[in-house]
């Protein structure tokens, strides 16, 4: 079987890092999956969302975004169409004016506003598709007076929202009406928060101006910064185009109106520009591929990839809880005790490491904030972050919180697990040595500084808060994170020959660190504190997932894992959406595809909204994205120096396929299951090194595009086989193939579950 040559596209993103970091280019080389393997237009058309009527709220709206700017389209009532406008980096800056108020009020996300269109007739139905392959919404809205056809998109490479409308028959829509958002923390407008400042003025009134066909809505901030929504209407409301942009100046150092105006003036909607927009999205999707026999789940997975590139980009801000789609929320910030971790979790396996640059860049640029977040006596060698922050990552952990045990010590350490994954998936040793390792060392030091030794020499962690549960000593949240950090530091120090003077101390602490507290029901929250009430977080189980310190491949720990999972899930009333994705991921790690599938289906049935957004008291972006990670973990898992192919496939799935999913060791992996059997595995080694595969593939031949003879070892591992190739060649593609494998262009097999499903609002 001939090997396919892959097209590579390289882009250079210049990341400007503040001192003491240098200005360095981040180079992304991405292999595109060719059309000979996937009929991309046909396959992606199956992933579209469809609306038979306009949604009535944020969670049933049509969402479009480019990583910074976004819109959400729905109806306020049967004669009013609403277009929410959002820009994800627009935050307040009154922290110096109100130093006693919390950052959720002084540095909160701010709503931009929305447009409305009033229809003459009553809206009766719609025929709209969100074409995620082209990132365009298009279709028609029917009223009792006629129809309105429309197309909307947010340009991939320009910060402009474009909406084209054409009303027909007797339908006459009124003009576009702009409604500025109230420039105040959305949390302040919620009823339940008890931390509201006593004196909290709104930002100054907006200033509306019109100049040369452009309309400007400038919203000043109390610190003399501001943001401007600029728009231009070509034609009229019944037949024309609306162009919208938003400029932002957080610190009175830029001209936000000029920025928005230039965006509109430079916008080009000719065929070449539209093609460039579409091509950006096409190249993005073609970096990896997943096909499932369950249409609902397959569609959901691809929509999450669409949402990821809609909420962040390599050169855009870190993703918060809303992305570019603002809404009423008590959480107008970035959360560090689970949410951000889950948001970025799918990017590695999906082969979209470039999206992680928004997070990694933020950690590096705001390194000093992370240092200043710890008490002054530890700033020489430690760093941390509290529960939530704005984009500057300022979230101090105070001496008073430490003394009371009310703080969450391990938030930064858990976050750095994902930064370390960037290394394991790329083998980028320079980034490991110069950025990841030093920051991980500081994060570990923050925990080490607080350890207390008992009379037996065992190190314990004093009272701290286990997220959303209780204050406890020896919290498993903290101990598991410290244990992972120490093991990782020791490993990196050895492999990179860094000769770190602290290596001996790390080994001593790790050897004498308190054991993870365990009771009759499995892992406890912490010392003498069992989980005996419903708890949506799985932070007390991080040693199982995602750290894999305690895992299913350790026979002595299988009962403990099962018991801990059962106890956590038996208390159901407080379980949230991410509890279900967490359960699915843990079951996938237990090689139980049926239970992973069951928990994901229950998540879809109970919690997932029509546009796949997720709601609690406000929007929280991470849960659907975490579910995408759970789906990946059913298909492939790479940890502990092994790549596991189809480790947790549901028994009802007979055919599934993936291409160019990225694995630890910098391998791109493709695999096909046909009629319940693994028939083909293809691996491209990007950095060389040892390759260890675990699969249920019984009989196969192995070949390479770089050499005629391949030395490998084959072992029995339970009911599966382990294949070890000690020396792969950089750029080499290896293929393990069954004689009965039949290669087909995707889409290659019919759906067996939810065959007629489309997300959106439609008859299923």
Where are these regions (language model features)?
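Beta-sandwich/jelly-roll carbohydrate-recognition scaffolds of carbohydrate-active enzymes
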Residues: 32-296, 302, 315, 686, ...
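Beta-rich accessory regions
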Residues: 33-36, 154-159, 167-187, 483, ...
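Low-complexity, Ser/Thr/Pro/Gly-enriched N-terminal "stalk/linker" regions
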Residues: 34-39, 48, 287-320, 372-396, ...
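Carbohydrate-binding/catalytic loop surfaces
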Residues: 322-334, 379-402, 458-477, 522-535, ...
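Active-site core of glycosidic bond-cleaving carbohydrate-active enzymes
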Residues: 336-369, 373, 393, 397, ...
């Amino acid at each position: 079987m001939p090997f396919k040559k892959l097209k590579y596209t390289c882009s250079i993103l210049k990341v400007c890092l503040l001192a003491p970091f240098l200005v360095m280019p981040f180079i992304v080389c991405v292999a595109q999956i060719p059309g000979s393997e996937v009929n991309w237009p046909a396959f992606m058309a199956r992933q579209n969302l469809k609306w038979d009527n306009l949604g009535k709220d944020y969670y049933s709206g049509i969402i479009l975004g480019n990583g910074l700017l976004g819109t959400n389209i729905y109806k306020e009532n049967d004669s009013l169409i609403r277009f929410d406008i959002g820009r994800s980096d627009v935050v307040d800056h009154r922290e110096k004016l109100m130093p006693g108020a919390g950052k959720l009020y002084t540095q909160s996300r701010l709503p931009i506003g929305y447009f409305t269109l009033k229809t003459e007739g009553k809206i009766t139905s719609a025929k709209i598709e969100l074409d995620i392959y082209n990132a365009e919404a298009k279709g028609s809205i029917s009223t009792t007076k006629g129809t309105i056809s429309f197309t909307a998109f947010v340009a991939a490479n320009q910060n402009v929202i474009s909406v084209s409308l054409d009303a027909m028959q007797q339908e006459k829509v009124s003009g576009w009406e702009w409604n500025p958002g109230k420039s105040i923390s959305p949390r302040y407008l919620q009823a339940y928060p008890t931390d509201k400042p006593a004196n909290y003025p709104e930002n100054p009134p907006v200033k509306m101006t019109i100049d040369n066909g452009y309309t400007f809505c400038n919203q000043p901030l109390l610190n003399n910064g501001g943001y401007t929504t600029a728009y231009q209407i070509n034609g009229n409301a019944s037949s024309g185009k609306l162009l919208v942009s938003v400029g932002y100046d957080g610190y009175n150092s830029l001209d936000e109106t000029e920025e928005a105006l230039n965006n509109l003036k430079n916008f080009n909607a000719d065929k070449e520009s539209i093609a460039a927009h579409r091509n950006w999205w096409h190249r993005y999707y073609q970096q990896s591929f997943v096909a499932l026999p369950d249409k609902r789940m397959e569609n959901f997975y691809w929509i999450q990839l669409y949402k990821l590139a809609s909420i962040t980009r390599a050169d855009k801000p870190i993703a918060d809880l809303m992305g570019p789609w603002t809404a009423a929320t008590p959480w107008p910030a970035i959360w560090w005790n689970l949410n951000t971790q889950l948001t970025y979790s799918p990017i590695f396996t999906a082969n979209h490491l470039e999206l992680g640059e928004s997070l990694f860049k933020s950690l590096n640029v705001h390194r000093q904030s992370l240092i200043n977040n710890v008490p002054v006596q530890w700033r020489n060698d430690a760093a941390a972050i509290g529960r939530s922050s704005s984009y500057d990552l300022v979230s101090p952990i105070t001496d008073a919180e430490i003394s009371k045990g009310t703080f969450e010590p391990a938030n930064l350490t858990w976050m750095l697990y994902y930064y370390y994954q960037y290394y394991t998936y790329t083998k980028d040793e320079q980034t490991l040595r110069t950025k990841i390792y030093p920051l991980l060392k500081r994060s570990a030091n923050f925990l080490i500084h607080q350890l207390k030794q008992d009379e037996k020499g065992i190190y314990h962690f004093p009272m701290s808060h286990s997220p959303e549960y209780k204050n406890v000593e020896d919290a498993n949240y903290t101990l598991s994170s410290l244990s992972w950090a120490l093991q990782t530091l020791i490993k990196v120090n050895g492999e990179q020959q860094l000769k770190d003077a602290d290596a001996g101390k790390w080994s001593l602490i790790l050897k004498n660190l308190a054991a993870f507290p365990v009771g009759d029901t499995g892992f406890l929250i912490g010392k003498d504190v069992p989980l005996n009430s419903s708890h949506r977080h799985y932070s007390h189980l991080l040693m199982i997932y995602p750290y894999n310190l305690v895992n299913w491949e350790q026979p002595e720990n299988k009962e403990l894992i099962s018991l801990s999972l059962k106890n956590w899930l038996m208390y159901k009333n407080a379980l949230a959406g991410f509890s279900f994705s967490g359960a699915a991921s843990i079951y996938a790690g237990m090689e139980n595809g049926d239970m992973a599938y069951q928990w994901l289906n229950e998540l879809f049935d109970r919690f997932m909204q029509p546009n796949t957004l997720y709601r609690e008291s406000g929007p929280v972006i991470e849960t659907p994205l975490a579910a995408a990670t759970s789906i990946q973990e059913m298909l492939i898992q790479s940890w502990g120096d092994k790549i596991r192919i189809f480790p947790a496939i549901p028994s009802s799935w007979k055919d599934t396929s993936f291409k160019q999913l990225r694995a630890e060791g910098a391998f791109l992996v493709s695999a096909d299951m046909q009629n319940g059997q693994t028939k083909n595995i293809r691996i491209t080694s990007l950095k060389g090194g040892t390759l260890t595969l675990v699969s249920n593939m019984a009989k196969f031949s192995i070949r390479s595009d770089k050499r005629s003879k391949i030395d490998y070892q084959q072992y029995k591992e339970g009911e599966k086989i382990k294949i070890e190739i000690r020396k792969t060649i950089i750029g080499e593609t290896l293929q393990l193939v069954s004689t009965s494998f039949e290669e087909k262009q995707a889409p290659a097999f019919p759906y067996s579950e939810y065959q007629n499903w489309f997300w959106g609002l439609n008859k299923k």
